[in-house]
């Protein structure tokens, strides 16, 4: 059956007519019905080869910010995977995803070390009465730590050179973490031990939930920079108002509102900074900015803890 199909398909068109004309026979021979076209003939056509299908729009592979300059000026990754065109991605796209996963792993490793150091300092200042009494009796160390924190933060946030070059980036981040841990530990020393532990648990649950939600949701928090800026300015001026009113009169409900606002704002900033690591949002961080990524998320978590401490904490007697 296959041989017969191939013999009919391979027969040149018009061969029978030429044989009849050569023998002088016209319209005497019965017409032979044409065989159905073969698979090769049916799938072949103009502009298409046999066995191929028409190509859709070419998918653009992802590019890291250090290998691609975005004309619009936004850094990082753009757009994610276009739906329905995964087969068009080149090997570079998958390599790029490996770079992004390595970047996220590096950021959270650094963040884990920062949080463990801070937790150790907070535990020392909370449970050790000798250390607690010393830091409360010497507030000068607090202001010195605040100055170191502010200087290292400005250096890491504003200067890309020290932030990207090893080992200066790790040295600055270590100094920054130790100073911030001292500030957090001293603040915790004024609160009851049970309150500190409760706020630690609440902070851990909130941060874990926000992180999982930020990785799973399709909502792009990185496109809400304007809203976050307005909320941050509201928080800033509310803090100034409290600083002015505090020497004259302490208003508990106003302080509670400020703590709720602060915890909410930095929870949103935690979602924003988490999605900056992912690379498939409107804005994202370069894989070289692992120090900056860890710095932002660490600050968000510390600020959430301190605002929860102001909201739920009980002062020591």
From Swiss-Prot:
It is a multi-pass membrane protein. Interacts with FAS/TNFRSF6 and BAX. PANTHER family: BAX INHIBITOR-RELATED, PROTEIN LIFEGUARD 2. Belongs to the BI1 family. LFG subfamily. GO terms for cellular component: endoplasmic reticulum; Golgi apparatus; Golgi membrane; membrane; membrane raft; postsynaptic membrane. The keyword rRNA-binding does not apply. InterPro entries: Bax_inhibitor_1-related. GO terms for biological process: apoptotic signaling pathway; cerebellar granular layer development; cerebellar Purkinje cell differentiation; cerebellar Purkinje cell layer development; cerebellum development; negative regulation of apoptotic signaling pathway; negative regulation of extrinsic apoptotic signaling pathway via death domain receptors; negative regulation of neuron apoptotic process. The gene is Faim2. Its main location: membrane. It is found in: Cell membrane; Membrane raft; Postsynaptic cell membrane. This is Protein lifeguard 2. Brain. Highly expressed in cerebellum, also found in cortex, olfactory bulb, and hippocampus. Disruption phenotype: Mice show reduced cerebellar size and internal granular layer (IGL) thickness in early developmental stages, delayed Purkinje Cell (PC) development, with an abnormal morphology and reduced cellular density, increased caspase-8 and caspase-3 activity in PCs and higher sensitivity to Fas-mediated apoptosis. Glycans are attached at residue 192. Residues 1-54 are annotated as: Disordered. Keywords: Apoptosis, Cell membrane, Glycoprotein, Membrane, Postsynaptic cell membrane, Synapse, Transmembrane, Transmembrane helix. It comes from the Eukaryota.
């Amino acid at each position: 059956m296959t041989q017969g199909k191939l013999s009919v398909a391979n027969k040149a068109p018009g061969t029978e007519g030429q044989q009849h004309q050569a023998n002088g026979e016209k319209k005497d021979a019965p017409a032979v019905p044409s065989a159905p076209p073969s698979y090769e003939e049916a799938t072949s056509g103009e502009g298409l080869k046999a066995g191929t299908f028409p190509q859709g729009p070419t998918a653009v592979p992802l590019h890291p910010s250090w290998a691609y300059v975005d004309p619009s000026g936004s850094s990082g990754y753009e757009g994610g995977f276009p739906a329905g065109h995964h087969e068009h991605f080149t090997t570079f796209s998958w390599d790029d995803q490996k770079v992004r996963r390595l970047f996220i792993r590096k950021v959270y490793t650094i963040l884990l070390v920062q949080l463990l150091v801070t937790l150790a300092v907070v535990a020392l200042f909370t449970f050790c009465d000798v250390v607690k009494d010393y830091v409360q009796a010497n507030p000068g160390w607090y202001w010195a730590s605040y100055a170191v924190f502010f200087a290292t933060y400005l250096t890491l946030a504003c200067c890309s050179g020290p932030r990207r070059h090893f080992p200066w980036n790790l040295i600055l981040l270590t100094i920054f973490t130790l100073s911030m841990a001292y500030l957090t530990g001293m603040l915790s020393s004024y609160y009851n031990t049970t309150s500190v532990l409760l706020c630690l648990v609440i902070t851990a649950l909130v941060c874990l939930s926000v992180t999982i939600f930020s990785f799973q949701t399709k909502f792009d928090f990185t496109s809400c920079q304007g809203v976050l800026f307005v909320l941050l300015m509201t928080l800033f001026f509310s803090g100034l108002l409290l600083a002015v009113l505090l020497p004259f009169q302490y208003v508990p409900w106003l302080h509670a509102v400020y703590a709720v606002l602060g915890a909410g704002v930095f929870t949103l900033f935690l979602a924003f900074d988490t999605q900056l690591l992912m690379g498939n949002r409107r804005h994202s961080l370069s894989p070289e900015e692992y120090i900056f990524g860890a710095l932002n998320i660490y600050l968000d978590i510390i600020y959430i803890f301190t605002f929860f401490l102001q909201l739920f904490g009980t002062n020591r007697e």
